Amino acid sequence: LAGPGVKPTLDGGEIRIYSGIRPATADDSLGAAVLLCTVRLNGTNGIVFDDSTAGILVKPTGATWTGNNVASGTATFFRIVKSADTGAASTSAPRLQGTVGVVAADLNLDTVALTSGLPTPVTSFNIGIYAQLP
């Protein structure tokens, strides 16, 4: 996520939730992971974060981040990507990857058992941005 900053890089993206083995890094190919859900602002537009406060990007309180599940499975990881991202290995595609769970994960959902055709809302989400020391 080097470049103009994390907020402008992630704004306008989408959260893709997958089942399967989480790649070692966000630069790696998705491999055999299965896309379960794509979460967007109001289900259709790119997500946008509030301005950073004390190094934390936060989902805006009134924003509705949701998506309809396109497959059934157990959610294991997510990526925040731009809509054109193919999931192939890349060191230049802006991506953020993390774990999915119901507690103590990078993205906590009400359930990790997603069912095709049902919605998956993201009710709260934040990213800690820490300064890198020289």
Each model region followed by its residue ranges:
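Small cysteine-rich, disulfide-bonded extracellular modules of the LU/uPAR three-finger superfamily
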Residues: 1-78, 83-134
